[in-house]
């Protein structure tokens, strides 16, 4: 990853198709299109590739998260369990839905742990926002059992994990509803874009209406459509979908390359005594966008992070100090900072986010580095990278 490394004539042709007829709106205006529907085509291909009943494209992964929550009935005052290690959008979307983020511990899958989830469930818990971080999955069997036991909605945030699977089932399709992101640095890209996927027709209907001001999309006269519900504008454009359609056709190739490149580096690093690797519940389903490894101590991890950079090993993320991916660095979240008061401020007994403690997660993330796996590496570049990694550890 990212998918833009494989941009080529296929993407140019799909975008040119849209420019030829000149209409970028995803709905209606059939007479102007010459039967060209890039958004519909990408949605249909997503359904086929993920073996899921419904897919709905949106303007971003964040839009997909908020739409999925609203479509699944998650709203005012509902508690949603979320990990402290995720992109901040996973939490912001909960706030914007009027719900209450509840942070739970992760384990060495780098995803929510079953024990962490159980520890924070209350009578107000409505859903789990299960984030498949860095391309791989959580302990799905155990977490699905928890959802069944407590009657919880399972939302899969697979924004970083398209192309991954668990026991042969695509990540994002295992829970009640799933989300993908197609921003500029994801496994495949629309430039900006996202998707909601589900086998639940009610959730799908809510999603496509909510993301287009409540339009029911029945008939061919947009102005005559009904508005069964309120909503917002999270529509994707045909230009973005055209780019994404070409990229989606390359997904299998992208995953194959990532897995090959990751294996070469992981095999080489396995001989380094102080290195251990992230737990992956189904290794065959790893999308391989990152190689995440752990070191014995926080101090050693900080040292190696600096030495990798000094030796030219780029794309290595020490998330523990990253401003966008770990709870302890989100002062704006902890202090509920926004341009105006958020719905959660109306809840008297809301969590004090300045006092959230996740010691197990801290112990894991302070010792974890994730290495981005690129598509464009040649065999020679991979060999050079391996040598530079070994140099960093030997110094």
From Swiss-Prot:
One of its GO terms (biological process) is polysaccharide biosynthetic process. Its cofactor is pyridoxal 5'-phosphate. It catalyses: 8-amino-3,8-dideoxy-alpha-D-manno-octulosonate + 2-oxoglutarate = 3,8-dideoxy-8-oxo-alpha-D-manno-octulosonate + L-glutamate. Disruption phenotype: A double kdnA/kdnB deletion mutant shows increased sensitivity to polymyxin B and bile salts. This is 8-amino-3,8-dideoxy-alpha-D-manno-octulosonate transaminase. Catalyzes the second (last) step of the biosynthesis of Kdo8N (8-amino-3,8-dideoxy-D-manno-octulosonate) from Kdo (3-deoxy-D-manno-octulosonate). It comes from the Bacteria. Kdo8N is found in lipopolysaccharides of members of the Shewanella genus. InterPro entries: DegT/StrS_aminotransferase, PyrdxlP-dep_Trfase, PyrdxlP-dep_Trfase_major, PyrdxlP-dep_Trfase_small. Keywords: Aminotransferase, Lipopolysaccharide biosynthesis, Pyridoxal phosphate, Transferase. Its EC number is 2.6.1.109. It comes from Shewanella oneidensis (strain ATCC 700550 / JCM 31522 / CIP 106686 / LMG 19005 / NCIMB 14063 / MR-1). Pathway: Bacterial outer membrane biogenesis; lipopolysaccharide biosynthesis. The keyword Aminoacyl-tRNA synthetase does not apply. The gene is kdnA. It holds the Pfam family DegT_DnrJ_EryC1. Disulfide bonds: none annotated. Belongs to the DegT/DnrJ/EryC1 family. The modification N6-(pyridoxal phosphate)lysine is found at residue 186. One of its GO terms (molecular function) is pyridoxal phosphate binding.
């Amino acid at each position: 990853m990212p998918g833009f490394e494989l941009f080529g004539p296929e993407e140019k042709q799909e975008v040119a198709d849209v420019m030829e007829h000149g209409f970028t709106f995803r709905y209606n205006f059939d007479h102007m299109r010459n039967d060209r529907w890039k958004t519909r085509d990408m949605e249909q291909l997503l359904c086929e590739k993920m073996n899921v009943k419904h897919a709905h494209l949106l303007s971003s992964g964040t839009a997909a998260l908020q739409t999925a929550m609203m479509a699944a009935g998650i709203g005012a005052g509902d508690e949603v369990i979320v990990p402290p290690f995720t992109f901040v959008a996973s939490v912001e979307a909960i706030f914007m839905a009027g719900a209450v983020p509840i942070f739970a511990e992760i384990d060495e899958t780098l995803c929510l742990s079953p024990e962490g989830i159980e520890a924070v469930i209350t009578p107000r818990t409505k859903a789990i926002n299960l984030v498949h971080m860095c391309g791989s999955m959580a302990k799905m069997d155990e977490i699905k059992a928890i959802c069944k036991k407590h009657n919880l909605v399972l939302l899969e945030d697979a924004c970083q994990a398209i192309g991954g699977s668990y026991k042969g089932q695509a990540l994002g399709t295992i829970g009640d509803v799933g989300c993908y992101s197609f921003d500029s640095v994801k496994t495949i890209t629309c430039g900006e874009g996202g998707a909601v996927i589900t086998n639940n027709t009610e959730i799908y209907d809510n999603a496509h209406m909510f993301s287009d001001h409540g339009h029911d999309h029945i008939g061919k006269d947009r102005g005559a459509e009904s508005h069964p519900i309120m909503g917002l504008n999270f529509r994707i454009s045909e230009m973005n979908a055209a780019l994404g359609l070409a990229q989606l056709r390359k997904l299998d190739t992208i995953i194959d390359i990532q897995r090959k490149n990751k294996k070469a580096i992981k095999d080489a690093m396995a001989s380094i005594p102080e290195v251990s690797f992230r737990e992956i519940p189904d290794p065959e389903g790893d999308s391989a966008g990152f190689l995440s490894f752990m070191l014995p101590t926080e101090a050693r991890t900080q040292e190696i992070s600096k030495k990798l950079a000094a030796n030219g090993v780029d794309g290595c993320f020490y998330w523990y100090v990253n401003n966008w991916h770990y709870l302890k660095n989100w002062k704006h979240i902890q202090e509920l900072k926004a341009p105006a008061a958020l719905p959660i401020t109306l809840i008297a007994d809301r969590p004090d986010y300045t006092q959230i403690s996740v010691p197990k997660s801290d112990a894991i993330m302070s010792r974890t580095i994730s290495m981005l796996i690129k598509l464009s590496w040649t065999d020679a570049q991979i060999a050079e990278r391996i040598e530079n990694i070994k140099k960093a550890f030997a110094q």
